[in-house]
Design a protein with these regions (language model features):
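Secondary-structure edge/capping motif, primarily at the C-terminal ends of alpha-helices
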Residues: 55-70, 98-105, 126-140, 174, ...
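Bacterial signal peptide processing site
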Residues: 24-26
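A cross-kingdom marker for long, charged
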Residues: 224-313
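Extended amphipathic alpha-helical interaction segments
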Residues: 146-256
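Bacterial N-terminal signal peptides that target proteins for export
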Residues: 2-11
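N-terminal Sec/ER secretory leader and immediately downstream segment
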Residues: 33-147, 290
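C-terminal motif of bacterial Sec signal peptides marking the signal peptidase cleavage site
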Residues: 19-22
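Amphipathic alpha-helical segments and their boundaries
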Residues: 28-47, 104, 180-194, 293
Length: 313
C-alpha cells in the first residue's frame, strides 16, 4: 500500500458554515439544531486528518519498499509522526457526545463512528511504534520488532485512510445540502444580501476547486465553473455588496485570488504547458506553490475559507 499525502481543505469551509447556521435568524431550523454535532465531527476531522497523512509519509519515507516493510538495515530511521494531544482529545469525548446527540443523522453518524474507531486504533498503533523507535530497540533486536510492528501499523493506516475518504465525502454532502437550503432561505427573506453572496461565493469556490483538483481535469467543466464563479464575483461587486466593510474587503480579495489562480491553472491545462524546472523545484520544496498549479488553487481556497471564518467571529 502506498498513499500520497493530499490536501484536505474542503471540509474546513463547513466550520464557518455550521457556525453561521447557528447564529443567523433565518437559518433553517434543522441546520441550527444539528450545528453542534456537525462542528464536533468537523473539529475531529480537521484536527487529525492532515497530521495522520504526514505521519504516514514520515514513517514510510526511509523505507526502500514500504509494502515489504523495514529490513532493519536502513539509515535515517524514523518513528511515525504523532498527532497533538488536544487533537486526539477532540476525537474522543466530544466526538462520542456528538454521536449520541439527537436528532440522529443516519447518513453521517455511522461514518463518523467508524472514523473515530479507526483513528483510535491507528493512534494506539502509532504510540506503540513511537515508543519502540524512540528506545532504538531495533539496534538490539536485529530489527525483529520493527518487522512485527509494520504490518498491523500499515493495516491501521489503510483502514483509517478509507474511513477518512468516506468521512470527507459524507461531510461534503451534508454541507452542500445544508448550504443550499440556507442560501434559498436567505434569498427568500432578504434577497441577494451580503449573507447570500457570502455563502454563494464559498459554495461556488468549492465547486471550482473540486473541478480542478484532479489529475486530468475536464477543461470544459473547469472553464464553465470558472466563468460561473467570476460572474458571481462581478455581480457582487456591481451590487456594491460589503462596501465599506473592511472584513468583506479581505474576503473579496481572497475570492479574487482564487479566481486568478484558477484562471492560471485553466490556461495551463488548455495550452498543455508543463511545469518548468524552477516551478517543479518550488513545488517540491513545500514552500509557496507556483502559480497555475493545483496546490496554488488549493492554497487560495484555504485563504478564502480563513477569511470567511474570521468574518463569522
Amino acid at each position: 500500500m502506498t498513499h500520497q499525502l493530499r490536501y484536505v481543505p474542503l471540509a474546513a469551509a463547513m466550520a464557518f458554515a455550521a457556525l453561521l447556521a447557528g447564529c443567523q435568524k433565518n437559518a433553517p431550523a434543522a441546520a441550527v439544531e444539528g450545528a453542534d454535532k456537525i462542528n464536533a465531527y468537523i473539529t475531529c476531522f480537521n484536527g487529525v486528518e492532515q497530521p495522520i497523512h504526514e505521519s504516514y509519509q514520515q514513517y514510510i519515507g526511509w523505507m526502500q519498499d514500504p509494502e515489504a516493510g523495514p529490513t532493519g538495515k536502513e539509515s535515517g530511521i524514523h518513528a511515525p509522526g504523532t498527532v497533538l494531544s488536544h487533537h486526539v482529545d477532540e476525537c474522543g469525548t466530544p466526538m462520542t457526545a456528538a454521536l449520541a446527540q439527537t436528532p440522529a443523522k443516519p447518513e453521517l453518524d455511522p461514518v463518523a463512528k467508524t472514523y473515530q474507531e479507526r483513528f483510535t486504533t491507528l493512534n494506539e498503533r502509532i504510540g506503540e511504534a513511537v515508543r519502540y523507535y524512540d528506545r532504538e530497540d531495533y539496534l538490539r533486536d536485529d530489527g525483529k520488532g520493527m518487522k512485527a510492528l509494520h504490518a498491523p501499523l500499515m493495516q491501521a493506516y489503510q483502514a483509517f485512510f478509507e474511513a477518512g475518504e468516506a468521512m470527507n465525502t459524507a461531510l461534503e454532502h451534508n454541507e452542500d445540502t445544508r448550504r443550499q437550503a440556507q442560501i434559498d432561505a436567505i434569498e427568500k427573506e432578504e434577497g441577494r444580501s451580503a449573507s447570500w453572496y457570502h455563502l454563494k461565493i464559498i459554495g461556488e469556490g468549492k465547486q471550482l476547486v473540486q473541478v480542478l483538483d484532479n489529475d486530468t481535469p475536464d477543461l470544459a467543466a473547469a472553464q464553465s465553473q470558472l466563468a460561473r464563479y467570476q460572474g458571481l464575483l462581478e455581480e457582487a461587486q456591481k451590487a456594491k455588496i460589503g462596501q465599506g466593510d473592511a472584513m468583506w474587503g479581505h474576503m473579496e480579495r481572497s475570492a479574487d485570488k482564487l479566481a486568478r489562480e484558477s484562471g492560471r491553472l485553466v490556461e495551463r491545462i488548455r495550452t498543455k504547458t508543463p511545469l518548468n524546472k524552477s516551478e517543479q523545484m518550488l513545488l517540491e520544496s513545500g514552500s509557496m506553490p507556483p502559480g497555475g498549479t493545483r496546490q496554488a488553487v488549493l492554497a487560495s481556497y484555504n485563504d478564502l475559507i480563513d477569511m470567511s471564518n474570521r468574518m463569522s467571529h
